[in-house]
């Protein structure tokens, strides 16, 4: 053994050929700070080996290296700028020393080689992959860019255009696609990967492969004429501004870094990369996107624990077909859980089956599943007008009309048909679960399972715990949601649960802003283009359905009369009274017509302003800042109240529910990350200006206390860098 560290070891595999194996104690290899330090030590040892003729890098895991340890990122981001830059430089010295070893080097890649793992293999002369390999630089998806030489070596290896596509999209390349663009030199089977790698290194040792030339290519300037450079970088910047927009600076920064260093040799180019990487770590966007990643890991770890605590769901049922029931049935069946879809009307069953068939056809057209698989999924959905076979089902999801009397009757009826261990779950958007449970003999076997529309696209499922719901029931339904490929978040019961409870104060802010003379088109534009929502409130109401919102608004007002009861007729009432329900009937705030692809396209409707005029006295100009504040303060206040009341368990789960359920701008990270970013005192000052408008603008005492104590909602990160040395 030449070197033995906690996460990697080096020994000779054959005479003169050293073998460095990444093999961390955990389930996967991560290029964390400890592993990086160990890699530096191993390379120091290799430089001292007099008989060294070649070096092979491989993994003792099914994946090569999944990337850097993202749990260390926020600490790195909090490190003083100069200290982080020094540390980054020292880290790059390690990869440059790997690249400069006086012998040929090769990486044998299995599974993922992402982020720092990709940057590590780029430092070697050759790369062989097995057919499971997936190689890429996903850093821009976290608001940063490659910082260990990825943006320097990749464009020199494969050319500027393909390198910029890999880096700016953040999407990994499968082995065959990586081979096409030159990221790897060959693909072999996993069984022969090491032998083939050793054989290739022997060819390099014998002079049959010019490893020195490959190496020098990565250390020299990018081979581009001035005209080629101008065209390449200008086109890339234009595409990025169109795709990523102004809210996500990392892709554009990466391109600018590559452009500025294009005519430089490696070490000078690395210094440019260092400067741009450090600048991105100072942005709130990077902290927000990394925060989302970490929050997602927390939510998924809770779901995994629930899966461990319960038996997998083998058979399920949906009560109520139509678009929603068909969507739920499709999602269950497509993930391998057969489902009985029951309705009292054949037309509804036909609609549900058509919805499932339509979604499967889209997958077939895109080449994502075969005709055989489509037939298998469809055949695992059983439409029925009766309860026959429901006694064998593990979980039954009720998805009938949003009416408490009807839902309670259906639930009581089906409880008599199922086995005593079966779980009943109601797909309701606003009705309290504890209210529906009153009709049941076994309320402990009942919970809420709130899907978002469209089911196949929206990742979130709210799992709602009623007063008498057992933990076993919660675990089983969380496990079922996970089986369906969804992200389940457990919330406690109240009207609207979490997502809809915080959405309707946002709509209240919109109604009040229109009452006070705001322009709905300007509000939509500000909330989309400036704040970053995928849809403004008027457009969102049209998509949700103004009739649906009108009904839900009444439920929320009944549940929280002190804040959500309306003081007179509002714009939702006015639209509802004029039979403007939104996309579903072609007219709401906007008018809708189907485009060439059959999707509803919104157009300005001249009558909308006349309807709004019936609930306001005059029009008033508002700044973007005023609009954002008046729209967001009611939602933020309600999110804080939900945390205070234990409706949602943590800031992390609240933020993920907002991002996955409502499309809260990811670059802002969720309400609590946003509050920490702007500062609680800043928020309190902003809210104070509007507190007389309505009770929804009055901030909870808890945030005042937190601000007075100088606290944040997320714990302050600890610096991951203790010294510049690695």
From Swiss-Prot:
The record marks 119, 139 as: Important for catalytic activity. GO terms for cellular component: fatty acid beta-oxidation multienzyme complex. Keywords: Fatty acid metabolism, Isomerase, Lipid degradation, Lipid metabolism, Lyase, Multifunctional enzyme, NAD, Oxidoreductase. Involved in the aerobic and anaerobic degradation of long-chain fatty acids via beta-oxidation cycle. Catalyzes the formation of 3-oxoacyl-CoA from enoyl-CoA via L-3-hydroxyacyl-CoA. It can also use D-3-hydroxyacyl-CoA and cis-3-enoyl-CoA as substrate. Its EC number is 4.2.1.17, 5.1.2.3, 5.3.3.8, 1.1.1.35. It comes from Aliivibrio salmonicida (strain LFI1238) (Vibrio salmonicida (strain LFI1238)). In the N-terminal section; belongs to the enoyl-CoA hydratase/isomerase family. In the C-terminal section; belongs to the 3-hydroxyacyl-CoA dehydrogenase family. Gene3D superfamilies: 1.10.1040.50, 2-enoyl-CoA Hydratase, Chain A, domain 1, NAD(P)-binding Rossmann-like Domain. One of its GO terms (molecular function) is enoyl-CoA hydratase activity. InterPro entries: 3-OHacyl-CoA_DH_CS, 3-OHacyl-CoA_DH_NAD-bd, 3HC_DH_C, 6-PGluconate_DH-like_C_sf, ClpP/crotonase-like_dom_sf, Enoyl-CoA_hyd/isom_CS, Enoyl-CoA_hydra/iso, FA_oxidation_alpha_subunit. Residues 311-726 are annotated as: 3-hydroxyacyl-CoA dehydrogenase. The keyword Cell wall biogenesis/degradation does not apply. The keyword Metal-binding does not apply. SUPFAM superfamilies: 6-phosphogluconate dehydrogenase C-terminal domain-like, ClpP/crotonase, NAD(P)-binding Rossmann-fold domains. Pathway: Lipid metabolism; fatty acid beta-oxidation. NAD(+) binds at residues 324, 343, 400-402, 407, 429, 453. This is Fatty acid oxidation complex subunit alpha. Substrate binds at residues 296, 500, 660. Residues 1-189 are annotated as: Enoyl-CoA hydratase/isomerase. The gene is fadB. NCBIfam families: FadB, PRK11730.1. GO terms for biological process: fatty acid beta-oxidation. Heterotetramer of two alpha chains (FadB) and two beta chains (FadA). Transmembrane segments: none annotated. The active site is at 450 (for 3-hydroxyacyl-coa dehydrogenase activity). It catalyses: a (3S)-3-hydroxyacyl-CoA + NAD(+) = a 3-oxoacyl-CoA + NADH + H(+); a (3S)-3-hydroxyacyl-CoA = a (2E)-enoyl-CoA + H2O; a 4-saturated-(3S)-3-hydroxyacyl-CoA = a (3E)-enoyl-CoA + H2O; (3S)-3-hydroxybutanoyl-CoA = (3R)-3-hydroxybutanoyl-CoA. PANTHER family: TRIFUNCTIONAL ENZYME SUBUNIT ALPHA, TRIFUNCTIONAL ENZYME SUBUNIT ALPHA, MITOCHONDRIAL.
